[in-house]
Amino acid sequence: MMRSHYCGGLNRENIGQEVTLSGWVHRRRDLGGLIFIDMRDREGIVQVCFDPKYQQALTRAASLRNEFCIQIKGEVIARPDNQINKNMATGEVEVLAKELSVYNAADVLPLDFNQNNTEEQRLKYRYLDLRRPEMAQRLKTRAKITSFVRRFMDDNGFLDIETPMLTKATPEGARDYLVPSRVHKGKFYALPQSPQLFKQLLMMSGFDRYYQIVKCFRDEDLRADRQPEFTQIDVETSFLTAPEVREIMEKMIHGLWLNTINVDLGKFPVMTWTEAMQRFGSDKPDLRNPLEITDVADIVKDVDFKVFSGPANDPNGRVAVIRVPNGASVTRKQIDEYTQFVGIYGAKGLAWLKVNDVNAGLEGVQSPIAKFLTEEKIKAIFDRTSAQTGDILFFGADKWQTATDALGALRLKLGRDLALTQLDQWAPLWVIDFPMFERDEEGNLAAMHHPFTSPKDFSPEQLEADPTGAVANAYDMVINGYEVGGGSVRIFDPKMQQTVFRILGIDEQQQREKFGFLLDALKFGTPPHAGLAFGLDRLTMLLTGTDNIRDVIAFPKTTAAACLMTEAPSFANPQALEELSISVVKTDKE
């Protein structure tokens, strides 16, 4: 037998038992006549004592070094009272080693487990990085999450059905990863950005509750919370309304938090997209932050200050305020830094006003813009924002999107900088009723979610006549400012689907080429259906308290979509390329 117990599982109940442990030397201490090691496996660490009573084991222990892979046979004994370590789960016991076997020695480590290592080092030697207890704990939590999800889905009548990895390229927002076909020369498969169309087809096939924990792929520019391959908890249902879908999924996430970290998330509030953008400047608001955005365009539309009056009189403009309670102590240097910060989001400046005495009107404020405001305007702004003595007001005035983005980002930064955001709290919500379409950089209409989302209370004719007025029957789940899941009611009427395609500039020929199979399937008694997908990586990130998605993926890529450990991607064998009828064209940059 190689193992009878895990190191991290030993406690007082095991005292007197003979155990066999297998794992790694985490730390070694030579005290002359005695040698102690901390022995580690995936479940934790236990102290092992080598005593002269068992001389052969003690002699062998002298050669042990960190990360040697070993086996210990010995007896669990109680630690003396003055040696109990309350910081360890196994701190009341130790193992008296009677036999020691070395499975494998370890070279000098390229990582130092007792210090911070660079991200590059950690990814290059990921198999060593994963030995660290905190990394092991994160992957164990991930396994616990998927286990809970599978049980929940099974208990609620969902079927785990796999969908293809090699599929057809369809426009879903990001670039596809393409896989060449050897048999069909010149043709390519695409790795799926999501199982979207296949899960809709499963609804058309009669499988009214589907789920899958599935890999997805997107060839896009990466951020700290993005990876080229990521994992979704993918869900689709038939004959359920949007509120019913949300109710089931909220129940799952509620149970997941209770099961994983023993936190009761309570009832999730529901907020429209419009309200979220107006009050918080984001469609994924972090409600742990008490700061809100207040519109004041109607108050300042006739002031003699074009920075305010211009956007205030522009139908596409916005003038709004963030009130920071007790923020008047913010220094001019900090204000300059905040002004520079909002510039990242396109804002041309940042007006501010300190409230030194809320009852003194203009005399009680300190601001470069005070000269443009009357007593009446000041009072109206104070009343609208509930300003108090000692507050500071920050103003955003620009095109609606620019002002909203800038103030939304500033709100988050102020919350962090001034310790207003309650970091020890959980704040979930649903955001619903998104616009059906948005303008892209060229000014063309694009689907805010994807082109298979159904509009709310619009006929195909109404949608074609007023596409920008349509509201999508879509919903996102947001927790602490992160979108952890999103979905929608799907289009199940072929006429509506063709209308959406036309609005997006996809003509009939392209519709047949790219989506002919879907349009055909919609003609054969398609049920009403709705679904959503959760990002498993992001859920795990939140539940383990890390801010980097790479910390919860066993073998992640860098922000350049590379694997430093295996050195992927790599050049292909010329013979393999020839069989695929592919030639590599070198550019001047190479």
From Swiss-Prot:
Q: Name one GO biological process term.
A: aspartyl-tRNA aminoacylation
Binding annotation for ATP: 218-220, 227, 483, 535-538
Q: Where does L-aspartate bind?
A: 172, 218, 449, 490
Q: What class of enzyme is it?
A: ligase
Task: One Pfam family, please name it.
Answer: tRNA-synt_2
Q: Which SUPFAM superfamilies match?
A: Class II aaRS and biotin synthetases, GAD domain-like, Nucleic acid-binding proteins
Described purpose of this protein according to its UniProt entry: Catalyzes the attachment of L-aspartate to tRNA(Asp) in a two-step reaction: L-aspartate is first activated by ATP to form Asp-AMP and then transferred to the acceptor end of tRNA(Asp).
This chain belongs to which protein, by name? Aspartate--tRNA ligase
Species per Swiss-Prot/TrEMBL record: Mannheimia succiniciproducens (strain KCTC 0769BP / MBEL55E)
Highest lineage ranks of the organism? Bacteria, Pseudomonadati, Pseudomonadota, Gammaproteobacteria, Pasteurellales
